[in-house]
């Protein structure tokens, strides 16, 4: 959006809006941003509240670094899996009980999936509605089709499904190299979004939540190139399954590694991170193939006609 409005420290440019932090400490006045008729910039007296989770487990360096970085900006609570739950997507545990324990550092951990953690937190554990759900920092990239499988994205998506803005942060390469740099970049992004405060009124039935997927190259902070808005790329098919013999003589099967990048053209998350940029992709949950609804409507009509002719009911 090109619309811009300045006044008393407020600049509105759609999602690129920024708010003078002094206004956040002012009395609870609110100013409407004309860039969007349903969005308000809310100026809070109270600190923002952030719920953190991940899929690598509550002891992973990524979530520890992220928590330390974000709690300089807001009140943060961590509810994360007890153990590594990578590639659990948005799975919920429905047929066994879940238990919540608290670690010495105050982190709460659950014997469940990333989505379990966020779901439990939002439906009773916290006792309040956070302003933002943040997941990560993941040990490895979540680009292209990774987002379908990712527990990191799944945790953020659970917050989004509850109408809360959410972000999934991942580091492109495994091993936690430059994790402090990634946490600092994540803090910078969250701070900018906090400045925007792009949320719908609490009483509105159409809460303006959003879901962002962010991938950060493993580089020193001053070497990272600017944030780049991207579409998801695409990988080749996964590598072949790995077959081994167990000590008991049974065949064991290990899921093969993710395929290499296939669609890594300019404009994709793969291309951006390969060039040293931090990639950011807005996601949605609607899996409907809108482009082909017309085709399938015609196909369904022909199928129905065939059924009628054949007399199959």
Report the location of each language-model feature.
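Internal, conserved structured core segments that host functional sites
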Residues: 120, 128-173
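A cross-family phosphate/adenosyl-ligand binding-site feature
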Residues: 50, 61-124, 128-129
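Short beta-strand segments
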Residues: 53, 79-81, 111, 135-138, ...
């Amino acid at each position: 959006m090109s619309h811009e409005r300045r006044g008393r420290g407020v600049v509105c440019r759609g999602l690129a809006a920024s708010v003078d932090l002094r206004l956040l400490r002012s009395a609870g006045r609110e100013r409407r941003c004309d860039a969007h008729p349903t969005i308000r910039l809310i100026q809070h007296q109270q600190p923002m509240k952030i719920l953190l989770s991940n899929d690598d487990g509550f002891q992973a360096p990524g979530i520890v670094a992220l928590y330390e970085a974000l709690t300089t900006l807001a009140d943060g609570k961590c509810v994360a899996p007890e153990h590594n739950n990578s590639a659990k997507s948005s799975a919920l545990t429905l047929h066994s009980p879940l238990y919540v324990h608290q670690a010495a550092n105050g982190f709460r951990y659950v014997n469940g999936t990333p989505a379990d953690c966020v779901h439990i937190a939002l439906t009773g554990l916290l006792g309040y509605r956070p302003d933002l759900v943040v997941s990560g920092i993941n040990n490895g990239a979540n680009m292209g089709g990774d987002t379908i499988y990712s527990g990191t994205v799944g945790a953020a998506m659970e917050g989004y499904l509850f109408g809360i803005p959410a972000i999934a942060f991942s580091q492109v390469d495994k091993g936690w190299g430059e994790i402090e740099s990634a946490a600092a970049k994540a803090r910078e992004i969250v701070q900018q979004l906090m400045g925007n405060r792009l949320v719908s009124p609490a009483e509105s039935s159409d809460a303006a939540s959003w879901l962002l997927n962010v991938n950060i190259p493993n580089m020193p902070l001053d070497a990272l190139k600017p944030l780049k808005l991207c579409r998801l790329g695409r990988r080749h098919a996964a590598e072949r399954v790995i077959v081994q013999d167990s000590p008991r003589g049974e065949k064991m099967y290990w899921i093969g590694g993710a395929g290499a990048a296939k669609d890594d053209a300019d404009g994709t998350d793969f291309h951006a991170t390969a060039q040293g940029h931090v990639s950011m992709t807005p996601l949605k949950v609607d899996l409907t193939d809108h482009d082909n609804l017309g085709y399938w409507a015609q196909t369904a009509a022909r199928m129905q006609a065939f059924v009628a002719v054949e007399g199959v009911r």
